[in-house]
Swiss-Prot record:
GO molecular function: 2-succinyl-5-enolpyruvyl-6-hydroxy-3-cyclohexene-1-carboxylic-acid synthase activity; magnesium ion binding; manganese ion binding; thiamine pyrophosphate binding
Subunit structure comment from the entry: Homodimer.
Catalytic activities: isochorismate + 2-oxoglutarate + H(+) = 5-enolpyruvoyl-6-hydroxy-2-succinyl-cyclohex-3-ene-1-carboxylate + CO2
Phylogenetic lineage: Archaea, Methanobacteriati, Methanobacteriota, Stenosarchaea group, Halobacteria
UniProt name for this protein: 2-succinyl-5-enolpyruvyl-6-hydroxy-3-cyclohexene-1-carboxylate synthase
GO biological process, one term: sulfur compound biosynthetic process
Top-level enzyme category: transferase
Cofactor note as given: Binds 1 thiamine pyrophosphate per subunit.
Cofactors, names only: Mg(2+); Mn(2+); thiamine diphosphate
Acidic residues: bias regions: 399-413
Source organism (scientific name): Haloquadratum walsbyi (strain DSM 16790 / HBSQ001)
Polar residues bias: start-end ranges: 385-398
Protein family according to the UniProt entry: Belongs to the TPP enzyme family. MenD subfamily.
């Protein structure tokens, strides 16, 4: 591997070692100072490159690909504020445990604190949001330094994929010439072949294992779980997550129902055929109900904190014994009600506990949850569209209560029935092709999916940025996930209007990175989620400072980014079905804008919640 100068040798050596360690994709933000790295990645036969015009979008795209694959995705940029634009995605990767490798180019040391252009302090730029920061130092073509460089490459991959996974930041100072320009005498003639080419395979091979509890610890926990009323709660998890078969085995051995977050990897798929997967709890877990139910004795929890606030409040209020299982031993339970933390691999622990349990729990307890979830599903399925249609009508004199009361209890067979934004989420989950990767935005979409996205046997990989839960970078993250899909799997992104506005430039990746997507844009003209908060009662400033209606017309994105754009009203369910079916059965990328009213949707959510509670209590 001859090189024209030491910058080129340095970058080639590093990139070749990443490839030997399994890296097959990189996202590149164009820039001058990062030229050695960019050229090395671009010329490596085993690495696919994605070029991005915007640094923030590039980082989120890399995040999305790493989230979908579970493998490290590097992202490269030049010096200065380019690196700062990676910060939001780095924070998300850290909190969501996604393996990301950030490679920032830098100016030589003497240019720092000198007023030199495009020069900022990039040392530990991302603070404690990274698992490891290392300044590579200037290129030095010696055997020892090249071994160190290869070792650093291997270590960066090991650290990013360790437990917990997360981002790693490596900083590369380069002097000119940055291009692969021949520089006589730049590479010593006596440099050994191994120093230049490395070893066969990775320079440092990594072998890792899972944390497995000893038999006494397993038996102690199993004894506590040998009770009539228990729950399995699976919060958001990052791929590979927990093995569904292990969850099923423990659910059958214990008799416990499984409360599965939509981002858990458990709510959807074949597991639902044989295992009591509960998905509607966000729609009925209130004190009115749990005061009528016996409290759970014990809860076995996996993953991050559940999306559902009612579920978190239920666990806090009933105060059961709570085992928080985390392979990294980190605390991810913000109500501080967990009684035990178990540092173990979730899948291995479930298999161990399944073998150790002697008696299953109460079938009456399990059936209570199954029937409550069925009541929730039935109410949603049998609610007529007239509720939402009337609420959305201009200058309507009818109250929400009147409209709900006048709705036929058994519903309607009309295809054009609609009641709130949540129905969009449930219809997408039902009508999406099989298989599909579905990326859901923060704010209301993920909450509506939690409440309205009933468990299904269809193959759905549901992703979202629930680490730091920002609404920035949603489109870019979704398209990054889509870049990793086989041609037979569809990508569907569901986003609100503010998140869409935040990341419209991310749509450039559709063409630049050859990604195809169906994007469902729920446009309620502002921050509809604030209707769920007490500030709604204070107007002003509620409308101008929180809801922030914008009146933006998103249709021009059709021409800017060469995609198909359709607009339907939230009361036109048949129209949405037609547009969604066309989008998912024809070539190219599509945006389906569904125009809704956030306030009326919120009121209907409340009334549907009341109806579900009534149905459960009456039974």
């Amino acid at each position: 591997m001859s090189a024209p100068n030491q910058n080129t040798l340095w970058a080639r050596t590093f990139v070749s070692e990443l490839a030997a360690s399994g890296v097959d994709t990189v996202c590149i933000s164009p820039g001058s100072r990062s030229t050695p790295l960019t050229v090395a990645f671009d010329r490596h036969d085993s690495i696919e490159t994605f070029s991005h015009l915007d640094e923030r979008s590039a980082a989120y795209f890399a995040l999305g690909r790493a989230r979908r694959t579970g493998s490290v995705t590097p992202v490269v940029c030049t010096s200065g504020t380019a690196a700062a634009n990676y910060h939001p995605a780095v924070i998300e990767a850290s909190q969501a445990r996604v393996p990301l490798l950030v490679l920032t180019a830098d100016r030589p040391p003497e240019l720092h604190d000198s007023g030199a252009n495009q020069t900022v302090d990039q040392t530990k730029l991302y603070g404690d949001a990274v698992r490891w920061f290392h300044d590579i130092g200037e290129p030095e073509p010696t055997a020892r330094k090249l071994r160190s460089l290869r070792t650093t490459a291997a270590r960066s991959i090991m650290t990013a994929t360790d437990t917990p996974a997360g981002p790693v930041h490596l900083n590369f100072p380069f002097r000119k010439p940055l291009e692969p320009t021949p520089v006589p005498g730049d590479i010593p003639d006596d440099l050994s072949e191994e120093s230049i080419t490395g070893r066969d395979g990775a320079f440092v091979e990594s072998t890792t294992g899972n944390r497995v509890l000893d038999e006494n610890s397993v038996n102690r926990i199993a004894q506590s779980l040998s009770t009539s009323r228990g729950l399995i709660v699976v919060g958001p998890m990052t791929i590979p997550g927990v093995d569904p078969e292990a969850v099923a085995a423990f659910a059958h051995a214990s008799g416990f129902p499984v409360l599965a977050d939509p981002l858990s990897g458990i709510r959807y798929g074949g597991l639902t055929r044989t295992t009591p997967i509960i998905g509607g709890y966000d729609g009925y877990l209130t004190s009115e109900l749990w005061d009528q139910w016996p409290d759970p004795d014990v809860v076995l929890r996996f993953g991050a904190s559940p999306t559902s606030k009612p579920l978190r409040q239920y666990l806090e209020s009933t105060s059961p014994t709570q085992y928080l299982v985390d392979p990294a031993g980190e605390w991810r339970e913000a109500t501080f009600t967990a009684t035990d933390i178990v540092v173990a691999d979730p899948t291995q622990l479930l298999w161990q506990l399944s073998r150790a349990l002697n008696t299953p729990g109460s079938s009456t307890w399990r059936q209570r949850w199954i029937e409550a979830d069925k009541a929730h599903t039935d109410v949603l399925a049998n609610t007529d569209s007239s509720a939402h249609q009337s609420l959305a009508a201009t200058n309507s004199d009818s109250s929400t209560d009147d409209i709900i009361e006048n709705t036929d209890e058994e519903g309607s067979n009309e295809s054009d029935r609609w009641f709130c934004e949540g129905r969009i989420l449930s219809d997408v989950m039902t009508a999406a092709p099989d298989p599909a990767t579905i990326f859901v935005s923060n704010s209301m979409p993920v909450r509506d999916l939690d409440r309205f996205g009933s468990p299904t046997t269809q193959n759905r990989t549901v992703l979202g940025n629930r680490g730091a839960s920002g609404i920035d970078g949603i489109i870019s993250t979704a398209l990054g996930a889509g870049s990793a899909l086989a041609t037979t799997e569809h990508l569907i992104a569901i986003t609100g209007d503010l998140a869409y506005y935040h990341d419209m430039n991310g749509l450039a990746a559709l063409e630049r990175c050859d990604v195809t997507a169906t994007i469902v844009l729920i446009n309620n003209d502002g921050g509809g989620i604030f209707h769920k908060l007490p500030i709604e009662s204070y107007d002003p400033p509620f409308t101008t400072q929180f809801v922030t209606p914008h009146g933006l017309d998103f249709e021009p994105t059709e021409d800017i980014y060469d995609l198909s754009f359709a607009r339907v009203r939230g009361t036109d369910r048949d129209g949405f079905h037609t547009a969604f079916t066309e989008a998912t059965t024809t070539t190219g990328s599509h945006v389906i804008e569904v125009v809704t009213d956030s306030e009326s949707s919120h009121r209907v959510r409340e009334q549907l919640h009341d109806r579900v509670i009534k149905r459960i209590l009456d039974n």
